[in-house]
């Protein structure tokens, strides 16, 4: 694709499938391992009815890491909505109240709060030896490590590698390819909302339990490569006021907000094109409170992203118009949703930052464990893949440490 820096992942589905299975069991993903799907709320019922009128076939309440029944010492979803604000019931999987407490209970995990990593340290042989971090009082501390795993998301992870530059690694750690920070992706996104004559109350029930997957395919006849999904979405009033039509004023906008109770909504998520010019760099003129250069984030849509979004707007509006919408509201993409790329996985060292294990090409005891290792974004929400890669990487590190290779 012209203008894109597409690259094949150095792993296959066969490599990852066993770890997807482990992740689905760990997270309690619905519609896997005998776990039923979540019930559909009114927002989903409107969405599903319109989808079926358009002939869509792959329509259901999604594969969610939210309990539809009591599972894994967590209660079932109580359908109280506003899932973006956190889950008061603990039905939605979160490492904060599942894996971290369990890890601490083993005695083998220590979580240090209020710790901000300044840089990763290395020795004269180029092996990482630990990290320096600022504690809650601003004092600089040091933690030695046999292996360092970086999981700061696609903005903070490259920033950390770049801020760890030394005379041995003048362009930052693991950056011999010049690819650290490059190929930032955030998914092609947008939303479509619609008003109806009767109340929908989209905020009730699980916020995003609804999906149309028919468009998640490669079909260039639509005017773009790759694919996208449509997912139910119900925003709270403050969020809706900010994002329905940013900067809007006047009666057209306020009348739309007046119809909030009668609104249905969906989110668009699709594969955006990696571009080297979409990147994270350091801003040496602006420092954080610890005196470290902050990240600059550069992003511009690829023409393929724009074509895909326009197609999704058209289809989203058609879904609602098929079931009697009185108004539809295509909304602009959110500033960032799923931060991906910037330390991408590659078979060849010159093409990326890490290998198929998330192990940096340049430093064998330095790993990247988050979404920044994604080579491409795909049309899916990324959490399950991030967790699957992390489990696979952990197995690899344990194996390599056991045989003293690390």
Named regions from a protein language model:
Residues 376-397:
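A conserved FAD-binding loop/helix module that cradles the flavin
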Residues 2-117, 335, 342-344:
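Conserved redox-cofactor binding core of oxidoreductases
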Residues 40-43, 92, 96, 308-312, ...:
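Hydrophobic (often cysteine-bearing) scaffold residues that line and stabilize catalytic clefts
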Residues 9-13, 177-295, 303-306, 339, ...:
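FAD cofactor-binding and catalytic pocket of flavoenzymes
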Residues 60-62, 76-83, 118-121, 261-272, ...:
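A glycine-rich dinucleotide-binding beta-alpha-beta segment and adjacent secondary-structure elements
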Residues 11-22, 311-318, 392:
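A non-catalytic, amphipathic alpha-helix used as a structural packing/dimerization or gating element
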Residues 99-105, 137-142, 345, 351-361:
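A short acidic-Thr-Gly-centered motif at the start of a beta-strand
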């Amino acid at each position: 694709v012209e203008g894109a820096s597409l690259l094949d992942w150095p792993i296959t589905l066969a490599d990852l499938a066993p770890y997807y299975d482990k992740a689905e069991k760990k997270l309690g993903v619905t519609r896997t391992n005998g776990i039923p799907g979540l019930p559909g709320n009114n927002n989903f019922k409107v969405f599903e009815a319109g989808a079926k009128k358009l002939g869509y076939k792959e329509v259901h309440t999604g594969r969610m890491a939210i309990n539809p029944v009591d599972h894994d010492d967590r209660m079932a979803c109580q359908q109280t909505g506003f899932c973006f604000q956190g889950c008061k019931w603990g039905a939605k999987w979160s490492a904060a109240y599942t894996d971290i407490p369990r890890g601490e209970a083993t005695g083998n995990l220590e979580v240090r709060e209020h710790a901000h990593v300044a840089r990763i340290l290395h020795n004269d042989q180029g092996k990482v030896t630990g990290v320096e971090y600022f504690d809650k009082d601003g004092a600089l501390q040091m933690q030695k490590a046999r292996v360092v795993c970086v999981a700061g998301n696609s903005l903070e992870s490259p920033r950390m590698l770049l801020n760890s530059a030394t005379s041995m690694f003048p362009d930052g750690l693991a950056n011999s390819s010049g690819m650290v920070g490059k190929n930032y992706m955030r998914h092609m996104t947008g939303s479509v909302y619609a008003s109806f004559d009767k109340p929908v109350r989209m905020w009730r029930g699980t916020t995003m339990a609804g999906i149309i997957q028919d468009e998640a395919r490669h079909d260039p006849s639509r005017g773009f490569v790759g694919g996208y999904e449509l997912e139910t979405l119900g925003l709270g009033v403050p969020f809706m006021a900010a994002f329905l039509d940013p900067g809007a004023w006047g009666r057209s906008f306020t009348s739309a907000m007046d119809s909030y109770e009668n609104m249905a909504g969906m989110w668009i998520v699709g594969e955006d094109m990696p571009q080297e010019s979409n990147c994270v760099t350091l801003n040496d003129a602006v420092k954080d409170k610890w005196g470290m250069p902050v990240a600059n984030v550069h992003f511009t849509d690829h023409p393929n992203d724009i074509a895909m979004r326009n197609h999704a707007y058209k289809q989203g509006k058609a879904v609602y118009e098929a079931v009697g919408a009185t108004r539809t509201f295509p909304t602009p993409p959110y500033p960032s949703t799923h931060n991906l790329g910037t330390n991408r996985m590659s078979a060849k060292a010159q093409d990326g930052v890490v290998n198929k294990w998330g192990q940096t090409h340049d430093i064998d005891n330095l790993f990247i464990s988050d979404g920044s290792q994604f080579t491409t974004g795909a049309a899916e929400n990324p959490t399950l893949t991030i967790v699957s890669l992390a489990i696979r990487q952990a197995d690899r590190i344990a194996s390599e440490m056991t045989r003293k290779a690390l």
